[in-house]
């Protein structure tokens, strides 16, 4: 009789920290990979919805109890992704407000991501691809990522970070400022002088 695969729910928590887009991980408490940083994940209970499982994974593995936005990204079904047996991973991207205060949390910029257990690097890469493709298409998700106020430089930085993490070519950003100017969902803020240089263009959601 074939082995029924288990269903794992894995979260990809992203947060802007120190001016960089980062992944929040927790330390594994059990084998395999005990003590190593990994994405927060749990096995789906029989009476549990996906969003409930994501929330449980975030709280139990990293202490995260709030977030700005959550969205499903992909399903990973490699039979060898977990040495303990066949599992399906249903991955969710989660945009956080801030880094959680928890000793078991490890935060890595996307540009400095180590090799994580299982297929977690692939899960992160796919989540970044989904987020990059959703910029300005999904206004709620874009707003969660950029915050209420942001600069053109912030948009450019996020685009480059996500493209690199997704394994894509560096995006063309020459016309980002012009595209922002024509977007009816945001408005340009009055420039605030900063020293002798030209102040960065700042934007706010309307």
Locate the predicted segments by residue.
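NUDIX/MutT-family hydrolases
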Residues: 91-93, 100-137, 145-159, 176-179
């Amino acid at each position: 009789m074939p082995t029924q695969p288990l269903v794992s729910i894995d979260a990809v928590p992203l947060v802007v920290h120190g001016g960089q887009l980062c992944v929040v991980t927790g330390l594994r408490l059990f084998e395999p990979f005990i003590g190593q940083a990994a994405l927060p994940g749990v096995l789906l209970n029989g009476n549990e919805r996906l969003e409930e499982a994501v929330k449980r994974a975030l709280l139990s593995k990293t202490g995260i109890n709030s977030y700005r936005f959550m969205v499903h990204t992909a399903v990973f079904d490699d039979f060898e992704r977990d040495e303990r047996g066949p599992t399906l991973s249903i991955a969710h991207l989660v945009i956080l407000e801030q880094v959680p205060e928890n000793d078991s949390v490890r935060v890595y910029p996307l540009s400095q991501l180590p090799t994580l257990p299982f297929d977690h690097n692939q899960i992160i890469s796919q989540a970044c691809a989904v987020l990059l493709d959703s910029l300005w298409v999904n206004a709620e998700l874009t707003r969660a990522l950029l915050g209420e106020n942001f600069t053109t430089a912030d948009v450019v930085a996020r685009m480059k970070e996500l493209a690199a993490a997704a394994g894509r070519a560096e995006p063309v950003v020459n016309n980002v400022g012009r595209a922002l100017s024509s977007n009816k969902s945001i408005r340009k803020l009055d420039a605030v002088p900063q020293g002798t240089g030209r102040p960065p263009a700042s934007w706010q959601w309307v």
